[in-house]
């Protein structure tokens, strides 16, 4: 039987770690230390079986084949640890990984063209944001911008209002909480109607791409005063007719808050046990957004001549909507319907006639139980009547500013060429890019109790000219069906209104501001001083008096 003799153990005389270099065996001299891998099994003397390497043998990538299956430990590979380059200066040498990195052959370079046609990496669209996920067109390595913009910096938007240092945050509600609110409301009570409304010209329904009609500039005055500036609402408030007072445009923004991307603000006043929802003059609620929910929405620009900036497009959309709603009823030969005079129009002051608008004041019951008395009075609007005076319609306008860049992540469709044959695809694209705007229009029409929504497709006569436009089509919708198609929940909107009103009523009387965060899906309720926003209004009044 063979005997096993233990080799001698040489202790280090100076007490340091490891054997002394003087006692190192001759066969191990001049061999540098090689690092080992963390996955090495050091509990056995020898183990030639590596199940991980065998499992990965059939699924090796080009990079593992190139490196010979070498495992990396502590940032260095075992097979390449000696692959250093001998330099003239021995003191400056270092161990480097000499493995050649295999690039993705055939991958298209990311250039400026990725801005158009390739969706930006925005959080709302997920990684890449491109329709269909990671596109691998062109075979191997042909990723055409699918995730090339993953590290693209996200856009930082500005708040619609400057948050003052004296503003106190009372509540912060994210959209996830808002989406869970619900309150069923019965049919409203019609209180009164004011203004003059004219008949809708049915010839506009026959407009198509082969029978276009230019958009005319109609000199009509359209009023949209805030809640507190409405004399009719002031009368109802004095009589304690309701607990909440607002307009349909203000309440629609609040009820569709979960779809908002841009920042907005609503002024809320609590006085005499009542809540008033107001808007700032010339604030974001007075203008129509364009492609707010698109993957690559328009951006603000300091260049005043840029007609495709977010601000310029919003102003253009508001201008188009005003003229289109006036044009469809301006040449009507039917008799105008005036239940009561327009409360905002004064012939002594205005030289132009008022636009066709019927202001309907309606009362909605927001009570939770039978014993509670909690209601809201709204001022709603209708733009024309259809055939009979009782059949009211609202008129809205969609604007096409540049078909080459307006198509979003999909293929752009020129309205003048494709509206008649692909109206469904164009409408679906507009619903996707303008989800917040469409939802607000649907809510406003439902609150007003109109029978139809008339939506006009307005295109620029020349993509480089924002002054001349052409009507290329008109489409009709029933508000309730349109809301279902947009997945708009009226019960959820009423739940949001009741929740915000309850939060304000729990606070002492004063002024509050509800602000949608510009970069996060949430709203904040601020307690602000009573003189907030009044200094600017007084300055504007002084300037008007001087003029």
Curated annotation (Swiss-Prot):
Its main location: cytoplasm. Keywords: Cytoplasm, Initiation factor, Protein biosynthesis, RNA-binding. GO terms for cellular component: cytosol; eukaryotic 43S preinitiation complex; eukaryotic 48S preinitiation complex; eukaryotic translation initiation factor 3 complex; eukaryotic translation initiation factor 3 complex, eIF3e; eukaryotic translation initiation factor 3 complex, eIF3m. It is found in: Cytoplasm. It comes from the Eukaryota. Pfam families: eIF-3_zeta (PF05091). InterPro entries: eIF3d (IPR007783). Residues 1-22, 114-159 are annotated as: Disordered. Residues 284-298 are annotated as: RNA gate. One of its GO terms (biological process) is translational initiation. Residues 126-148 have a biased composition (Gly residues). GO terms for molecular function: mRNA cap binding; translation initiation factor activity. mRNA cap-binding component of the eukaryotic translation initiation factor 3 (eIF-3) complex, which is involved in protein synthesis of a specialized repertoire of mRNAs and, together with other initiation factors, stimulates binding of mRNA and methionyl-tRNAi to the 40S ribosome. The eIF-3 complex specifically targets and initiates translation of a subset of mRNAs involved in cell proliferation. In the eIF-3 complex, eif3d specifically recognizes and binds the 7-methylguanosine cap of a subset of mRNAs. The RNA gate region regulates mRNA cap recognition to prevent promiscuous mRNA-binding before assembly of eif3d into the full eukaryotic translation initiation factor 3 (eIF-3) complex. PANTHER family: EUKARYOTIC TRANSLATION INITIATION FACTOR 3 SUBUNIT 7, EUKARYOTIC TRANSLATION INITIATION FACTOR 3 SUBUNIT D. Component of the eukaryotic translation initiation factor 3 (eIF-3) complex. Belongs to the eIF-3 subunit D family. This is Eukaryotic translation initiation factor 3 subunit D. The lineage of its organism: Eukaryota, Fungi, Dikarya, Basidiomycota, Agaricomycotina.
């Amino acid at each position: 039987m063979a005997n096993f003799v233990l080799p001698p153990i040489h202790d280090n005389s100076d007490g340091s770690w490891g054997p002394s270099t003087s006692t190192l065996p001759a066969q191990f001299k001049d061999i540098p230390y090689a690092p080992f891998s963390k996955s090495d099994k050091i509990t056995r003397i020898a183990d030639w079986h590596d199940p991980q390497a065998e499992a990965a043998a059939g699924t090796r990538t080009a990079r593992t084949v190139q490196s010979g299956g070498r495992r990396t430990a502590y940032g260095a590979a075992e097979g390449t640890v000696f692959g250093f380059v001998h330099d003239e200066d021995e003191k400056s040498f270092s161990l480097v990984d000499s493995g050649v990195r295999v690039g993705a052959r055939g991958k298209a370079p990311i250039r400026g063209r990725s801005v158009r046609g390739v969706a930006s990496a925005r959080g709302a669209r997920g990684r890449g944001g491109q329709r269909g996920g990671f596109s691998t067109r062109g075979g191997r390595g042909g990723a055409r911008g699918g995730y090339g913009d993953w590290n693209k910096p996200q856009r930082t938007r500005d708040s619609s209002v400057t948050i003052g240092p004296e503003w106190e945050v009372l509540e912060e509600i994210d959209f996830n909480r808002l989406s869970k609110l619900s309150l069923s409301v019965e049919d409203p009570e019609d209180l009164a109607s004011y203004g003059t409304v004219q008949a809708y010209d049915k010839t506009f329904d026959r407009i198509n791409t082969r029978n276009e009609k230019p958009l005319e500039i109609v000199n009509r005055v359209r009023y949209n005063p805030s809640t507190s500036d409405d004399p009719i609402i002031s009368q109802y408030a004095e009589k304690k007719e309701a607990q909440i007072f607002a307009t349909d445009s203000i309440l629609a923004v609040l009820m569709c808050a979960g779809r908002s991307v841009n920042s907005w603000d609503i002024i809320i006043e609590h006085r005499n046990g009542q809540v008033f929802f107001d808007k700032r003059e010339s604030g974001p609620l007075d203008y129509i957004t364009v492609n707010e929910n698109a993957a690559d929405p328009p951006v603000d620009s300091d260049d005043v001549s840029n007609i495709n900036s977010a601000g310029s497009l919003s102003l253009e959309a508001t201008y188009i909507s005003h003229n289109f709603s006036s044009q469809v009823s301006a040449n009507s030969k039917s008799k105008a319907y005036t239940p009561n005079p327009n409360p905002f129009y004064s012939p002594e002051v205005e030289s132009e006639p008022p636009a066709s608008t019927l202001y309907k004041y309606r009362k909605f019951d927001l009570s939770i139980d039978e014993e509670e008395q909690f209601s809201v009075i709204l001022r709603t609007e209708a733009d024309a009547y259809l055939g009979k005076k009782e059949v009211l319609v609202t008129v809205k306008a969609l604007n096409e500013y540049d078909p080459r860049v307006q198509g979003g992540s999909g293929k752009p469709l020129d309205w003048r060429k494709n509206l008649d044959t692909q109206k469904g695809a164009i409408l679906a694209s507009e619903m996707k890019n303008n989800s917040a705007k469409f939802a607000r229009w649907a809510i406003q029409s439902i609150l007003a109790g109109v029978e139809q929504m008339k939506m006009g497709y307005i295109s620029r006569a020349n993509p480089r000219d924002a002054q001349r436009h052409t009507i290329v089509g008109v489409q009709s919708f029933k508000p309730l069906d349109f809301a279902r198609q947009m997945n708009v929940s009226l019960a959820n909107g009423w739940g949001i209104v009741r929740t915000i009103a309850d939060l304000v009523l729990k606070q002492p009387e004063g002024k509050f501001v509800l602000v949608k965060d510009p970069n996060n899906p949430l709203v904040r309720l601020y307690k602000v001083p009573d003189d907030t926003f009044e200094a600017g209004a007084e300055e504007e009044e002084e300037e008007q008096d001087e003029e």
